[in-house]
Amino acid sequence: MKVEEKQFDLEYINKYASQMTIGNGFFGIRGSQEEDYRNQVRGMFAAGVYNRPLGAESAELVNLPDVIRWEIKIDGEHFSLETMKVLAYERTLDLEMGELKRYALIETAQGKKVEVITCRVADQNNLHQAALKVVIKPLTEDCQVDVKTGIDGQQTNFGTQQLVEKELRVFGDDLISASYQTTESKIDIGIAAKFNKAGVFQAKNRRITASFSEKIRKNTSFTLEKIIVLSTSLQQTDPFKKSIAQAQKSVSYTEILEQSMSYWTDFWHQHRITIQGDSSFDQLAMDFAAYHLQIMTPRNDPSVSVGAKGLTGEGYKGHVFWDTEIFILPFFLYQFPEVAKNLLLYRYDRLEGARQKARDYHYQGALFPWESAHTGQEETPKFAALNIKTGTRQEVASAAAEHHISADLAYAVQEYVQATEDQSFLETKGKTLIHETAAFWLSRAVKVDDHLEIHRVIGPDEYTEYIDNNAYTNYLAHYNVALAVKYQAGDPLFLKECQNFLDKLYLPVPNKEQLIPQDDTYLSKPVIDLTTYKERPGSQSILLDYARSEVNELQVSKQADLVMLLYLLPEYFSQPIVSKNLHYYENKTIHDSSLSKAIHAIEACRIQEMEWAYHLFQEACLIDLGPDPHSSDDGIHAASLGALWLAVIFGFSGITVTNGTLSISPRLPSAWEKISFPFIWKNHRLLFVLTKKQIVIKKETKETLPIFVNGDQYQLEKELILERRGK
């Protein structure tokens, strides 16, 4: 499958740059055009390379020196898709081989027709390496071709300089290199570029370039290859020397492309969700999601995690949110369990920062930061951008009240432990995380009469701030503390306090209309018509008509909140309750968060409303792949891509994991004939093949595995074939 751009359009330039990112979990390079265009945002990012600029509240994922720019002249005329006559154009990101390729047939001012092809690919074997290539072929007359490219340390984060130059060097006539250091975090960056031709070099102002000039005869090609090596002091000592040494090994573009193709061929064979149905778009959306989940996530480094935009852009400053554990980690848990473990180790290694945040708020245990970067301290700014009309700044309440993140982490620990049976992790790390987060909730609850409540919080719905007894928060806190008791994560006195908490914590239950209140006041607030706002999800257009404080006093939800609870704890709620609440809260939810629609789709599946579920799923697919030209300018929506995977696996395929038991009750939409996918469970690699008539489950291991299918238990040995009941 391919992501395709059929026509060059400046309006879409940054959206395609995000969509067409290449990477390998260590770095990501935005799919920006090789030439400079107005408003284009370039970007290369390395996992974990953060810096806190002078005077800034928050650390930022550093936009590293640019390496993809080609400044091309044909007979002295600058190559530009904006100023030249473009006769043919196509740009594709081939998801099956990881290559971004652009073809342009242009006509120069002198009337010469010239093909210009640019390609790039990230090395999937040596994660520090990428390959770039430009091929220029005159079709009608000979041409003079001049190309300049290099390493540009003048790159910034939205105008903020993050790097200082340490050294610029050349080696021979085909290798340039640069050394930089982040201004505050003092991370060393080494970059080298090796060419297949001899160049002329120039270095100035944090930038080093190589220039190449040739007279090219008609119907012959000028081919320039550039092999990039990126190293940082987070992984290596003396990254400058390491990058130079690697670049001197002289691999070719073709060699890197071939091993990338081999890697991706194996990846798709082992991990693809395959959908046969009416629309090829569904398959593209799932491949797009899996591709980006794979290139945004570090494979073997527990010191780093996944930011809200992955490695595709500067949005949210590259910070790590609850999204990672709840929406992204499950993909890896059931495909690459070791990667899921590393994501949990990232949190464990920053436990002291969470303990400090709890102390800062006068609580016990560990309160994990709402936004995390490299240190483990809270990175959420205290105030939002300046309101130019009022001259004031809106308080950002997330860090102070969106405390469910600690329970979310405990939930993820439990998901990992039951899926892998990794007792070593549980004993050495998991119990500590569960204990510390449980201790936080014991101190966070307040006594009201003869029971406990949790006040002044924000649930997943960020349009509803500082409310009491948010159902999602209370239930997840209860679940968190119950895990401490389950695993005896603490001394007898602590466990006694946990049991008291479990006995006395208020858990909202359905009222006489069978509705579970999202919080103490939500259902008593005024209701307004949300039709216009729901037609523009993700735009936060309601804030153009209402102040945030006014929205807070309405039955308006930004995203799945109570419905998120139904999704995470399905065993707690009957199907009639789920149906009643899903319908009610869907009408109150604008889906201004990219995380929302896929979760509502899962719950629609669980109440057998398949066409509604499929409609919600397809709308979720359009968040990054839809027609809005600016939906992804600052990067793709990382967690929403994880949510698409969740929707197919836990929604349409009907998989549930409860108390260490794996169950499946498939519910395919009418548009799908067949779906197949792999799933790793307790060290067994399973393959599910689901049609409207049959359920086939295969496994390669010898041990018998119990599994529930449509409520009936089976013992899976090698293969289980069952006829479908109903749809």
Predicted regions and their residues:
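Acidic/polar, glycine-enriched structural segments that form the non-catalytic walls/loops
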Residues: M1-Y316, Y546-E550
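Helix-terminus loop motifs that line ligand-binding clefts
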Residues: T297-T312, E338-Y411, V417, S424-T428, ...
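Active-site core of glycosidic bond-cleaving carbohydrate-active enzymes
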Residues: F321-E352, E402, T428, A482, ...
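Acidic/histidine-rich catalytic neighborhood
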Residues: E436, F440-L493, E497
